[in-house]
C-alpha cells in the first residue's frame, strides 16, 4: 500500500483531499485532487470537464453568424475578446477588410474586456489571500463597464456585438463621451487598489516567491499572455503581430523578472492602466474626421442591410432573409487567427469546406495550458498557497472545458 503511494516510511502515507468543485477559492467548477505530505503539496490532479458543453461540435452545426454567441460563453468575464478571434478568422477566409471605425470600436471594447477581466482577477486574487476590500471597489468599476457593454449591445455579458465584417451597430456619441469620462477617474481607482495591496506586508508574504515559473518553463508549458510576461518575455500579440489598428496605438508592455504570483499581479495592474490609455486613443480617433464612416463592410451578402433600406428595397429584404436563414458561403480553406485575450493567446483554427457552416472550429484556450501546469507549479508549496497560485493563473472554466 505504502509503495503504491510512493512513500518510503512504513506506516506513513500521504493524505488525499478534494479541493472543489464548490470551494470558494476554486473559481467556478474546478476540482483539484491534492496529495499532501503534512501541509506540503506533493501532487495536484486537476479534474476538468464539469462545464463541458461541446461548443466546438455545436459550432459545426450553425452558420457563421449563429456561431458568434458561443464565443461569449467561453471566457465569460471578457466576452468580446473571444468573438474577435472568430471574426478575424472568418474575415481572413473571406478576404474582407473591416472599415476603420469598426476596427476602432472593436479595439475599444476589447480593452474594456481586458479591464473587466483584470479587475475581477486582481480583486479575487486579493480575496483568495484574505483581503476583503478590493473586490468591493473593483466590482463597482466593473459595473460601470458592464453598462457600457449593455449600451452598445443590449446585454451586460453575452454581448454578441461583433459581426464578421465589423460590429453590429455604431456607438452613440453620448456613450463615447461617457467612456471617455470614465477613464481618468478609473486610474485613481487603480491607484487606490495599488495603495491597498502592492506594499501590503500580508499580501506580499502570500505572493512573493510563490508559484515561480522560469521563462524556459513558461514556453515549454505553452503559456501565453500575463504568464509569459511575468517570467520576463515581452511577448504580446498586440505588438508582435498587430491586428486591427493596434499598430497605431501607443502603449507599453509591462514584464516581470521573478515569474512569481506577485509579478503577475503587478503586470495586471499596469495592463489596466495601459488599457485605459489605449481606450483614450481610440476615443480620440473615433471623434476625428477619419474615424467617421461605416462600422461594417457594406456587402449585403455578408452584413445585413440597414432597416431603412429594407423598408424601401425588395433586394435588401431578400438579402436580409437569406443572411439570417441560410447564411453566407465561406471559401474553402483553413486559417488560424489569434488575439491577445486578457488570459493569454486565444486562438481559433477555422476549417471551411466552402459551405455556410464551419467544417471544424478548434478553439485554443489560454487557460487550458495554464491549468495543465498546476501540478508542476504547486509541488513543494503549502496547501494555503494553492489558492494564491490558482488566483494568479487567472482561470475561467468556460474556456477550459468549452
UniProtKB/Swiss-Prot annotation:
Record keywords: Cell inner membrane, Cell membrane, Membrane, NAD, Quinone, Translocase, Transport, Ubiquinone
- Subcellular localization, as worded in the UniProt entry: Cell inner membrane
Membrane as a keyword of this entry, yes or no, is yes
For this protein, what reaction is catalysed? a quinone + NADH + 5 H(+)(in) = a quinol + NAD(+) + 4 H(+)(out)
- Which PROSITE patterns does the entry mention? COMPLEX1_49K
EC numbers on record: 7.1.1.-
Record's bilayer topology term: Peripheral membrane protein
Question: InterPro entries in the record, alphabetically?
Answer: NADH_Q_OxRdtase_suD (IPR001135), NADH_UbQ_OxRdtase_49kDa_CS (IPR014029), NDH1_su_D/H (IPR022885), NiFe-Hase_large (IPR029014)
What the entry lists under Gene3D superfamilies is as follows: Cytochrome-c3 Hydrogenase, chain B
Q: Give, as one word, the top-level EC class.
A: translocase
Functional description taken from the UniProt entry: NDH-1 shuttles electrons from NADH, via FMN and iron-sulfur (Fe-S) centers, to quinones in the respiratory chain. The immediate electron acceptor for the enzyme in this species is believed to be ubiquinone. Couples the redox reaction to proton translocation (for every two electrons transferred, four hydrogen ions are translocated across the cytoplasmic membrane), and thus conserves the redox energy in a proton gradient.
The UniProt entry's sequence similarity note says: Belongs to the complex I 49 kDa subunit family.
Quaternary structure per UniProt?
Answer: NDH-1 is composed of 14 different subunits. Subunits NuoB, C, D, E, F, and G constitute the peripheral sector of the complex.
Q: What is this protein called?
A: NADH-quinone oxidoreductase subunit D 2
Amino acid at each position: 500500500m505504502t509503495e503504491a503511494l510512493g512513500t518510503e516510511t512504513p506506516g506513513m502515507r500521504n493524505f488525499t483531499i478534494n479541493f472543489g468543485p464548490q470551494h470558494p477559492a476554486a473559481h467556478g467548477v474546478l476540482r483539484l485532487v491534492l496529495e499532501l505530505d503534512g501541509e506540503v503539496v506533493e501532487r495536484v490532479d486537476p479534474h476538468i470537464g464539469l462545464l463541458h458543453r461541446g461548443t466546438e461540435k455545436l459550432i459545426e452545426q450553425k452558420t457563421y453568424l449563429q456561431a458568434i454567441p458561443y464565443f461569449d460563453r467561453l471566457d465569460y468575464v471578457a466576452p468580446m475578446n473571444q468573438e474577435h478571434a472568430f471574426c478575424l478568422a472568418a474575415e481572413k477566409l473571406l478576404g474582407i477588410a473591416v472599415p476603420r471605425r469598426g476596427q476602432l470600436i472593436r479595439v475599444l471594447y476589447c480593452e474594456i474586456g481586458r479591464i473587466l477581466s483584470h479587475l475581477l482577477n486582481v480583486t479575487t486574487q486579493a480575496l483568495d489571500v484574505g483581503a476583503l476590500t478590493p473586490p468591493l471597489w473593483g466590482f463597482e468599476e466593473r459595473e460601470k463597464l458592464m453598462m457600457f457593454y449593455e449600451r452598445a449591445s443590449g446585454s451586460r455579458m453575452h454581448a454578441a456585438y461583433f459581426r464578421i465584417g465589423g460590429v453590429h451597430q455604431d456607438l452613440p456619441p453620448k456613450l463615447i463621451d461617457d467612456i471617455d469620462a470614465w477613464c481618468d477617474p478609473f486610474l485613481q481607482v487603480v491607484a487606490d487598489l495599488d495603495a491597498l495591496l502592492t506594499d501590503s506586508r500580508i499580501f506580499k508574504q502570500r505572493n512573493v516567491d510563490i508559484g515561480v515559473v522560469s521563462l524556459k518553463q513558461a514556453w515549454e508549458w505553452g503559456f501565453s499572455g500575463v504568464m509569459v510576461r511575468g517570467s520576463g518575455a515581452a511577448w504580446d500579440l498586440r505588438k508582435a503581430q498587430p491586428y486591427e489598428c493596434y499598430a497605431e496605438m501607443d502603449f507599453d508592455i509591462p514584464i516581470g523578472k521573478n515569474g512569481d504570483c506577485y509579478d503577475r499581479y503587478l503586470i495586471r495592474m499596469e495592463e489596466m492602466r495601459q488599457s485605459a490609455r489605449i481606450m483614450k486613443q481610440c476615443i480620440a480617433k473615433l471623434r476625428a474626421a477619419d474615424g467617421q464612416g461605416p462600422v461594417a463592410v457594406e456587402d449585403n451578402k455578408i452584413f445585413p442591410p440597414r432597416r431603412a433600406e429594407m423598408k424601401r428595397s425588395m433586394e435588401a429584404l431578400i438579402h436580409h432573409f437569406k443572411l439570417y436563414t441560410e447564411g453566407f458561403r465561406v471559401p474553402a480553406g483553413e486559417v488560424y487567427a489569434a488575439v491577445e485575450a486578457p488570459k493569454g493567446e486565444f486562438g481559433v483554427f477555422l476549417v471551411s469546406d466552402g459551405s455556410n457552416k464551419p467544417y471544424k472550429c478548434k478553439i485554443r484556450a489560454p487557460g487550458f495550458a495554464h491549468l495543465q501546469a498546476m501540478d508542476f507549479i504547486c509541488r513543494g508549496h503549502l496547501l494555503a498557497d494553492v489558492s494564491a497560485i490558482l488566483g494568479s493563473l487567472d482561470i475561467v472554466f468556460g474556456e477550459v472545458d468549452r
